[in-house]
Structures are given as C-alpha cells and as structure tokens.
Amino acid sequence: MIFPDNIPLNPLKNGQLWISHYPGKRGIENKAIQAEMDLLELKKRKIDIVASLLERKELAELQIANLFELIKKHKFSHYYFPIKDKSAPKNKVQLRRFLNNLCDEIQKDKKILIHCNAGLGRSGLIAALICKKLGIVEEPIPFIRQYRPGAIETREQEKLISSLDLA
C-alpha cells in the first residue's frame, strides 16, 4: 500500500504536494498489481498529477516497466523528468521548465504526487525546489525533512537546492 507524505503549501489555496516511493514498490510478487492498487489509493486521495523521476532503465530493473502506462490508464496527468539515482539534474533549463510546470499546476489547485524509487532523494530535491520557487519557506531542506524524514540524500542535491536561481 502506498502512504504518501503531504508537504503543506499554505497559504496556497487547495494545491497540494505529496511525496512517495513509486507506485507498486511494496508489491512482493507482482508489482503491476500493487501499482494498480496504489494508483487506486491515490485516486481516493484525489491526486491529479503524478510526477515521475525514475529513469526508464530503473523501471525495468524494478520490474515495473509498464508503470507509465498504468498511470495513464488511471487517468492521471503525468509529468516525467528522469534524474539519475543519488544525483541532481545537470540541465538547469529543463529543470526550471519542469519546476515551472509543476508550480503552475499547484497554483491551479492541483494535487501532485512526486515519486522516485524510495521517495527520498530525487523526490525530496524536487519538492524542496518547488517550495523554494513558491516562496513557502526560506529553508526548504529542513522543511521537507520535517515531513519526509531522510529526504534529500546527497550533498549534490543540497547544493543545488541552495544555489539554483529560480527567479
């Protein structure tokens, strides 16, 4: 079962930001069946958008190569921005575009789930950058870790959060 953590975005109306492991992760024998169950749970929580950070090769390695098809089957909007595990994106232009898209959706009161593998490093990174861009907090790293312990796993991720100009 999927149990995403909510990152409070007050005072932003009804837009919501959630972080989790990938749908299907807890599936022991059949990850696709678990992914279906997890996606149904996300629908119950009124999640509108799934933002995936896994690389395509990871999907195969994790035995959930059809995850994106399942996301579409369950009628979620889907944003895809692959980031190598334990690292930070190199292309800042594409990163800013991705963040702008997600922030626009939040400001339209959409509910977004961000996931990578465990929902810690890459997901925490993107959540922190969204909070920084939206001006939710001045120190996004401890803020995200308060709601998702273990989030933002590497110095490279921490440095990017501190240094990236999002104006």
Residues covered by each model-derived region:
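Cys-dependent protein tyrosine phosphatase-like superfamily
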Residues: 1-113, 125-167
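Short cysteine clusters
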Residues: 116
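Conserved G/P- and acidic residue-centered "switch" motifs that form tight phosphate/ATP-binding loops
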Residues: 119
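Conserved SAM/SAH-binding loop-helix junction
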Residues: 122
